[in-house]
Curated annotation (Swiss-Prot):
It comes from Neisseria meningitidis serogroup C / serotype 2a (strain ATCC 700532 / DSM 15464 / FAM18). The gene is mutS. GO terms for molecular function: ATP binding; ATP-dependent DNA damage sensor activity; damaged DNA binding; mismatched DNA binding. ATP binds at G607, P608, N609, M610, G611, G612, K613, S614. It comes from the Bacteria. This is DNA mismatch repair protein MutS. Keywords: ATP-binding, DNA damage, DNA repair, DNA-binding, Nucleotide-binding. Belongs to the DNA mismatch repair MutS family.
């Protein structure tokens, strides 16, 4: 379109939009933010607002949509949650100051990963932005949180990239717009940048300038292998600078993270353990929602961080444990005090980027004074000593804020009444002029009545006409000569005098001057606080850590969590362990033991559907995870050896986006585990092979279990419905059979949820179907077919020798077919043993005993 065909205002808009083609532009016009053309169409659809038109361009109506500026935050929040970025274009010039449209410019860019405004953020979630820079060997990751000042980098590989992004829970991902950019499982929140922005040389130059250092060796970034990490960090820092229109001063150094710091968990494991999100995508009931007794939002965010980053450093874990133990008698008063603490972390972030509001500073002041009053007995905990020593360091900042900010300032700076009385003499004088105007008006009214003798004379004010003297119609003709007529009404006349006009000018000027001076003083306070940011961030981190540690103490005291012990040898020993989430959802929870060590590394878990196998396996993993956060655990006792990773393969569904079936997803997750699990890993495998035919599934389950035993040698909980696998302990001493017990009462079943030695006798599938409400007709049909299949299997057992033709890895190694036969023999022996177990010889009559003998003989025939 030609510029001559559009208005000057539209020319201005198009020029701004050309610089932000990948973003929605909120263009300020009076009391609205307007959007035009395609932006208007998209915004109308996403925000459910009216799409209209304004004028024409090249003969076509210009589509337009808008939102009120005072409600913009709620609309921005919705757009950000949808992964959209928005350029905020404000009026920065005076209306009517010159020819053409009022001057406008983009003052900030709101993106999903660079939010600082509390209205746009979830209180209990950390908002991170991640930059991804690939090369042939490594992928460099850099991530930051503008709310906390976190700034870290790491080297990873393509196969672990999605797991890292799942761990970081990135709100926005920066990728180079190049052919070698990695393909991500998620497409939401992805921002493409020119590939040159990820250049290592440019990144190092920007980073060294920002941190004021000669090189990045002090951050652990040295050598060519770190080039992609440096490039990612540089691209990220530059992106933050561009979106915020300034270089943030609160990023807390740059640290290089390694795999050895935390227990590894892939995306599937985090999902299956439901750490912060249920399998259905809800926030509750999860491990996080169940444990979160934190008094502050900072504490809740740190708790989520600790749960997703279980430590491997035993010294750091023990330091947390000692603090938890020391707080056991102090956590209640501590949490009561912490409830009065504002979100210092996010207030500090808003100070850093220059958009803190008056009440942010008031809340910060009150919180710093409150923290300084925390009095704890460290009881030998060095961590508590360190944390509580931080708070007095901020008293000088709190005192500066007490002097500068009113006890209860206005919400918005533009409304005035923010700076405290006595802070600045000129502001006090301007306020005196405004606040004592009523006295002047009363004095003037009394003086003028006495001078003129006019009884109806009143001195008043309104926003349209300012100050005026009002006389009734009957007395208006007697007005003195120095009264200048200002307005005529039906029953009155309004006048102005030189004295009143001078006062009006003084008051209105004082108001404008006071607002301008308050803004200047407030900006000065914010600027002075920049130097205090490191100490404020330390206080925020210390308060959050105290909050989480006191929460751990509350859990230990109120939910009977115990302090786990750590061993240097391979062991997972748990006495009467409980699932921390499930036990809060049910009236009675059955506790269970777990014993894995160098002799028994794989627990083969069988039992009925709904018997509790998946719950038990998750329970073990969650207890191990919690122990490594420093939290006490739901058990009577626990001893845990070295753990490097936790893997889970529990349940699966079709991945339609990647065109992968349920079975393909299952096999992909299984393959990942077999390739990455080590002797120090904990592996949970549930129903491997169930997504294919019986023989295929059995063969795969056998192979996977054997691989875990012989190659990975991991601690493994292997749940299966293939009873044929219960032979494994005969061939592998490191495997042990355990089962979830159930009790049959007639045609009904009671699940005991108790772990017991040995394999299960049966699966009780039809009994579970009955509990699920299947029609009686269908249940009878199922039972009939089951009986037929069992009889057929018994009559045709040699057919199972199909497996005997399978080559084994070693000549002397038993093959699957032989194990199937042996497993069936054990299964039938179990049936006979169960039948005998039910008999009570002392209570049988001779006739009943003879009848039972014939029944047992028939049973032997059916299983032989």
């Amino acid at each position: 379109m030609s510029k001559s065909a559009v208005s000057p205002m539209m020319q201005q808009y198009l020029g701004i939009k050309a610089q932000h083609t990948d973003k929605l532009v909120f263009y300020r016009m009076g009391d609205f933010y307007e959007m035009f053309f395609d932006d208007a169409v998209e915004a109308a659809k996403l925000l459910d607002i009216t799409l209209t038109t304004r004028g024409q361009v090249d003969g076509e109506p210009v589509k337009m949509a808008g939102v009120p500026f005072h409600a913009a935050e709620q609309y921005l929040a919705r757009l950000v949650k949808l992964g959209k970025s928005v350029a905020i274009c404000e009026q920065v010039g005076e209306v009517g100051a010159g020819k053409g449209p009022v001057e406008r410019k983009v003052v900030r860019i709101v993106t999903p990963g660079t939010l600082t405004d509390s209205a746009l953020l979830e209180d209990k979630e950390t908002n991170r932005i991640v930059a991804v820079s690939p090369d042939k060997k490594y992928i460099g990751l850099a991530w930051a949180s503008l709310q906390s000042g976190e700034f870290k980098t790491k080297l990873t590989t393509v196969d672990k990239l999605d797991d890292e992004l799942a761990r970081l829970q990135a709100a926005e991902i920066l990728l180079p717009d190049s052919k070698n950019a990695p393909q991500l499982q998620t497409a939401s929140g992805v921002t493409r940048l020119n590939a040159w922005q990820f250049a290592a040389d440019a990144g190092e130059k920007l980073l060294t300038e920002y941190f004021g250092c000669q090189d990045l060796r002090g951050f652990g970034l040295d050598g060519k292998e770190h080039a992609v990490a440096i490039g990612a960090a540089g691209a990220l820092l530059n992106y933050i600078r561009l979106t915020q229109n300034l270089m943030p001063q609160h990023l807390d150094g740059l640290s290089l993270e390694t795999d050895s710091q935390y227990i590894g968990m892939d995306a599937a494991t985090r999902r299956n353990l439901e750490i912060t999100q249920t399998l259905s995508g809800k926030k509750s009931p999860t491990l996080m929602s169940t444990l979160d007794l934190c008094a502050t939002h900072m504490g809740s965010r740190l708790l989520a961080l600790w749960l997703h980053h279980p430590l491997r450093n035993r010294a750091h874990i023990r330091a947390r444990q000692e603090a938890v133990a020391a707080l056991e008698s102090q956590y209640k008063p501590l949490q009561c005090r912490l409830k009065n603490i504002a979100d210092i972390e996010r207030i500090a972030a808003r100070i850093a980027v220059g958009n803190a509001r008056p009440r942010d500073l008031a809340s910060l002041r009150d919180s710093l004074f409150e923290l300084a009053q925390i009095d704890l007995s460290a009881n030998g905990s060095s961590l508590l000593e360190t944390l509580k020593a931080v708070f007095p360091e901020n008293l000088s900042t709190a005192e500066q804020l007490r002097q500068a900010i009113l006890p209860e300032p206005s919400v918005w700076l533009k409304d005035g009444n923010v700076i405290n009385h006595g802070f600045h003499p000129e502001l006090d004088e301007l306020r005196r002029i405004q606040n004592h105007g009523d006295e002047f008006l009363l004095d003037l009214e009394a003086k003028e009545r006495e001078r003129t003798g006019l009884s109806t004379l009143k001195v008043e004010f309104n926003r349209v006409h300012g100050f005026y003297i009002e006389l009734s119609k009957t007395q208006a003709e007697q007005a003195p000569a120095d009264y200048q007529r200002r307005q005529t009404l039906k029953n009155a006349e309004r006048f102005i005098t030189p004295e009143l006009k001078a006062f009006e000018d003084k008051v209105l000027t004082a108001q404008e001057q006071a607002l301008a001076l308050e803004k200047q003083l407030f900006d000065g306070v914010l600027k002075n606080l920049q130097t205090a940011l490191p100490q404020l961030q330390k206080a925020a981190k210390a308060a959050a850590a105290l909050d989480v540690l006191s929460t751990f103490s509350a859990l230990a005291k109120e939910r009977n969590f115990v302090r786990p012990e750590f061993a240097d040898y391979p062991v997972i020993h748990i006495e009467n362990g409980r699932h921390p989430v499930v036990e809060q959802q049910v009236r009675h929870f059955t506790a269970n033991h777990t014993d894995l060590d160098h002799k028994h590394r794989l627990m083969l878990l069988t039992g009925p559907n709904m018997g509790g196998k998946s719950t038990y396996m998750r329970q073990v993993a969650l207890i191990v995870l919690l122990a490594h956060t420093g939290c006490f655990v739901p058990a009577d006792a626990a001893t845990i050896g070295p753990i490097d990773q936790i893997f889970t393969r529990i349940g699966a569904s079709d991945d339609l986006a990647s065109n992968r079936s349920t079975f393909m997803v299952e096999m992909s997750e299984t393959a990942y585990i077999l390739h990455h699990a080590t002797e120090q890993s904990l592996v949970l495998m549930d129903e491997v092979g169930r997504g294919t035919s019986t023989f295929d599934g059995l063969a795969l389950a056998h192979a996977v279990a054997e691989h875990l035993l012989q190659k990975n040698k991991s601690f493994s909980l292997f749940a299966t419905h293939y009873f044929e696998l219960t032979y494994l302990p005969e061939a592998h001493a490191a495997a042990v059979n355990m089962h979830l017990s159930a009790l049959e009462q007639g045609q009904d079943i009671v699940f005991l949820h108790q772990i017991q030695p040995g394999p299960a006798g049966k699966s009780y599938g039809i009994a579970v179907a009955k509990l699920a409400g299947l029609p009686v007709r269908a249940l009878k049909s199922a039972q009939k077919h089951l009986n037929g299949l069992e009889n057929q299997a018994a009559a045709n057992r040699p057919q199972l020798d199909i497996f005997s033709t399978m080559p084994s890895e070693k000549g002397d190694e038993p093959n699957v077919g032989n194990f199937v036969d042996k497993a069936e023999e054990k299964h039938f022996e179990g049936i006979l043993a169960a039948a005998l177990e039910k008999l009570d010889p002392d209570s049988l009559t001779p006739r009943e005993a003879l009848s039972e003998l014939y029944r047992l003989k028939d049973l032997c025939k059916s299983v032989s």
